[in-house]
């Protein structure tokens, strides 16, 4: 495979590089969109076996946020590169599904962070995707983050004021799923 990667699992490709005298393993997981509302592991896709991720279709369909990065490695080497990242709504769609199937604190915290970014860049309910994935994701976010009884905000932070802020951000950015 190009760039020295080798297939180590059905959807995982790895290569080792020397980093300041130590081996550093680089890994890439190949994913495909799931057109259901749940993670579908071990899906045949040509010669690969991959994971199908709900919400990924939204990220692929929307314009990415292009980030230009300049970083200095611990070796002193400077790297400059450009990477397309999911814009905030796409990230919220994927993270909402991740939270729903894992109920992990890190996913709750990520949702809060992305909600803050979405609000900061001026996104509103009018920007939300209109299709089935948008409606399903809105339902997940309102259920788990948009009400006082929802557990998501408490998993993201113990601060009650910030929990209230998270609920307010959901109301500001995510349309009600019943509309």
Annotated model-derived regions:
Residues 1-179:
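Compositionally biased terminal segments of proteins
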